Design a protein with these regions (language model features):
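N-terminal Rossmann NAD(P)H-binding glycine-rich loop of SDR-like oxidoreductase domains
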Residues: 154, 162
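Adenosine-nucleotide cofactor-binding segment
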Residues: 120, 147-150, 166-217
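Glycine-rich beta-strand-centered segment in the early N-terminal region that forms part
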Residues: 22-39, 52-95
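Rossmann-fold dehydrogenase core element
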Residues: 230-272, 276
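Residues forming the Rossmann-fold NAD(P)(H) cofactor-binding site
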Residues: 159
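C-terminal hydrophobic helical "lid"/dimerization subdomain
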Residues: 259-303
Length: 303
């Protein structure tokens, strides 16, 4: 038997249960992964709490919680050629990642070899947030010389967006609470307080692009400052963003995006702060910490 964190009904984190599932063998094109770490994202509990939206993400009850993972391959099907037993891997799966054994079809996207220069706790945080940041930057056409406004810059996607934007040659100003000023400065960004009057506080900053990771306040301020819609993007789908501003999801990532992220880590251009690591048995504490939105960095569960 293997342990898994699942929900059988939609709702708040208290609907989650640790359950025992039978160990299974991979089919011809599948690999079995012994999961070591699970990276948490706000979408994990947002989808769990929204039965209207959940079907859009392929949720089928009972659903295994979370989507990002890292671990080691312990068995492969006879048709698998790109992976072998003992390979350290990471990625994302919409079938749910918080399980000691994850079966992954190699015909699907989303499974990557883990390089030696990075550990499982870090790679378990890369796929959803890193891919989403890469897509958001591409859709906002961020280039060298831009001054980019990032709304919600200290969050899980924000820490990737801030750093990847600088690799592209942009200057970054991030909205966040005043308590995160030093944290964002360490990532190379200037912090500015969110809330009423944002456009006024930004009027001398010469903003040329904007990415919204928290609320449409960022987009509204950027529009007020004259930023064009084709220089903006958002990860917030509901409510709909202002006309002409595209939404960005990690599912739209290019195959080259993860290679770019790993190269940035290898070249010390991108760091992934881990705010906290919790045993799978302490999943409620981990989720509650993320839900209060005051953690500086990613939150990880481990088996």
């Amino acid at each position: 038997m293997v342990k898994a964190l699942q929900y059988k009904t939609f709702g708040k984190p208290d609907v989650l249960q640790l359950v025992d599932l039978p160990l299974v063998h991979p089919k011809a094109d599948e690999v079995s992964i012994k999961v070591s770490h699970v990276g948490l994202n706000p979408m994990d509990w947002a989808i769990m709490g929204n039965p209207e939206v959940a079907p859009n993400f392929g949720v089928k009850l009972p659903q295994t919680f979370a989507y990002d993972f890292a671990g080691i391959i312990d068995e492969i099907g006879p048709e698998v050629t790109d992976f072998k037993v003992g390979d350290h891997v990471f990625g994302t799966t919409m079938r749910g990642a918080a399980t000691e054994q994850l079966i992954f079809s190699t015909k699907e996207r989303g499974l990557f070899h883990r390089p030696d220069f990075v550990e499982d706790d870090v790679t378990s945080t890369l796929a959803v947030a890193g891919h989403t940041a890469a897509v958001a930057l591409r859709k906002a056409h961020v280039t060298a010389g831009d001054t980019l406004l990032v709304g919600g810059a200290a969050g899980g996607v924000g820490i990737f967006t801030v750093q990847l934007a600088q690799i592209l040659g942009a200057k970054v100003i991030g909205t966040a609470s005043d308590s995160t000023a030093d944290f964002l400065q360490d990532l190379g960004a200037e912090q500015i307080s969110y809330g009423p009057g944002l456009a006024d506080r930004l009027k001398n900053k010469e903003i040329t692009a904007a990415i919204d990771l928290f609320s449409h306040e960022t987009l509204k301020a950027a529009l007020e400052l004259g930023v064009k819609a084709d220089k903006m993007s958002t990860v917030i789908m509901y409510p709909e963003p202002p006309a002409g501003i595209p939404t960005a999801t990690g599912g739209e990532a290019l195959p080259s995006d993860m290679e770019m992220i790993l190269n940035a880590i290898s070249n010390h251009q991108l760091t992934v702060p881990i705010a906290a690591k919790y045993s799978i048995d302490d999943y409620l504490e981990a989720i509650k910490l993320q839900m209060n939105r005051h953690a500086h960095g990613k939150i990880v569960l481990y088996f």
